[in-house]
Amino acid sequence: MANSAQARKRARQADGQRSHNASLRSTLRTAIKRVRQAIEAGDKAAAQGVFQQSVAVLDRIADKKIVHKNKASRTKSRLSAQIKALAAA
Protein backbone atom coordinates (compact mmCIF):
# COMPACT_ATOMS: atom_id res chain seq x y z
CA MET A 1 0.00 0.00 0.00
CA ALA A 2 1.27 3.45 -0.88
CA ASN A 3 2.02 5.34 2.32
CA SER A 4 3.40 8.68 1.16
CA ALA A 5 1.58 11.26 -0.93
CA GLN A 6 4.13 10.76 -3.70
CA ALA A 7 3.58 6.99 -3.71
CA ARG A 8 -0.20 7.43 -3.80
CA LYS A 9 0.10 9.78 -6.76
CA ARG A 10 2.43 7.40 -8.60
CA ALA A 11 -0.05 4.57 -7.98
CA ARG A 12 -2.84 6.68 -9.50
CA GLN A 13 -0.67 7.55 -12.48
CA ALA A 14 0.37 3.93 -12.99
CA ASP A 15 -3.27 2.84 -13.02
CA GLY A 16 -4.16 5.41 -15.66
CA GLN A 17 -1.13 4.55 -17.76
CA ARG A 18 -1.90 0.84 -17.54
CA SER A 19 -5.43 1.29 -18.86
CA HIS A 20 -4.24 3.66 -21.62
CA ASN A 21 -1.49 1.24 -22.68
CA ALA A 22 -3.97 -1.66 -22.66
CA SER A 23 -6.16 0.28 -25.06
CA LEU A 24 -3.24 0.92 -27.41
CA ARG A 25 -2.15 -2.74 -27.27
CA SER A 26 -5.70 -3.73 -28.18
CA THR A 27 -5.61 -1.37 -31.17
CA LEU A 28 -2.33 -2.97 -32.24
CA ARG A 29 -3.69 -6.51 -32.00
CA THR A 30 -6.77 -5.51 -34.00
CA ALA A 31 -4.62 -3.98 -36.75
CA ILE A 32 -2.49 -7.12 -37.00
CA LYS A 33 -5.59 -9.30 -37.02
CA ARG A 34 -7.02 -7.35 -39.98
CA VAL A 35 -3.86 -7.97 -42.01
CA ARG A 36 -3.90 -11.68 -41.20
CA GLN A 37 -7.56 -11.94 -42.22
CA ALA A 38 -6.81 -10.27 -45.56
CA ILE A 39 -3.89 -12.66 -46.11
CA GLU A 40 -6.05 -15.69 -45.32
CA ALA A 41 -8.69 -14.41 -47.74
CA GLY A 42 -5.97 -14.31 -50.42
CA ASP A 43 -6.65 -10.69 -51.35
CA LYS A 44 -3.20 -9.21 -51.93
CA ALA A 45 -4.37 -5.68 -52.72
CA ALA A 46 -6.49 -5.47 -49.58
CA ALA A 47 -3.71 -7.04 -47.52
CA GLN A 48 -1.22 -4.42 -48.73
CA GLY A 49 -3.60 -1.58 -47.93
CA VAL A 50 -4.34 -2.83 -44.44
CA PHE A 51 -0.65 -3.63 -43.93
CA GLN A 52 0.30 0.02 -44.52
CA GLN A 53 -2.18 1.10 -41.84
CA SER A 54 -0.95 -1.52 -39.39
CA VAL A 55 2.69 -0.50 -39.96
CA ALA A 56 1.77 3.04 -38.91
CA VAL A 57 0.09 1.69 -35.77
CA LEU A 58 3.05 -0.58 -34.99
CA ASP A 59 5.58 2.23 -35.38
CA ARG A 60 3.55 4.63 -33.28
CA ILE A 61 3.16 2.14 -30.44
CA ALA A 62 6.82 1.09 -30.61
CA ASP A 63 7.87 4.75 -30.40
CA LYS A 64 5.86 5.03 -27.19
CA LYS A 65 7.66 1.92 -25.89
CA ILE A 66 4.42 0.02 -25.32
CA VAL A 67 5.89 -2.82 -27.36
CA HIS A 68 9.60 -3.25 -27.99
CA LYS A 69 10.90 -1.87 -31.28
CA ASN A 70 12.33 -5.29 -32.18
CA LYS A 71 8.93 -6.93 -31.72
CA ALA A 72 7.37 -4.29 -33.97
CA SER A 73 10.07 -4.82 -36.59
CA ARG A 74 9.73 -8.60 -36.42
CA THR A 75 5.94 -8.40 -36.79
CA LYS A 76 6.21 -6.07 -39.80
CA SER A 77 8.78 -8.35 -41.42
CA ARG A 78 6.69 -11.49 -40.97
CA LEU A 79 3.50 -9.89 -42.25
CA SER A 80 5.36 -8.45 -45.24
CA ALA A 81 6.80 -11.87 -46.08
CA GLN A 82 3.33 -13.42 -45.92
CA ILE A 83 1.96 -10.76 -48.28
CA LYS A 84 4.84 -11.32 -50.72
CA ALA A 85 4.12 -15.05 -50.61
CA LEU A 86 0.58 -14.31 -51.83
CA ALA A 87 1.99 -13.04 -55.12
CA ALA A 88 4.02 -16.21 -55.62
CA ALA A 89 1.07 -18.47 -54.82
Swiss-Prot record:
Record organism: Dechloromonas aromatica (strain RCB)
User: What GO biological process, any one, is recorded here?
Assistant: translation
**Source species, domain of life:** Bacteria
Please provide, in alphabetical order, the Gene Ontology terms of the cellular component aspect for this entry.
Answer: cytosol; small ribosomal subunit
* InterPro entries in the cross-refs: Ribosomal_bS20, Ribosomal_bS20_sf
| Protein family per UniProt | Belongs to the bacterial ribosomal protein bS20 family.
Q: Give this protein's Gene Ontology molecular function annotations.
A: small ribosomal subunit rRNA binding; structural constituent of ribosome
Checking Pfam families in the record gives:
Ribosomal_S20p (PF01649)
**Residue ranges, annotated region (Disordered):** 1-26
The portions of this protein that span the membrane are none
- Function recorded in the entry: Binds directly to 16S ribosomal RNA.
Q: Which UniProt keywords apply?
A: Ribonucleoprotein, Ribosomal protein, RNA-binding, rRNA-binding
The molecule here is called Small ribosomal subunit protein bS20
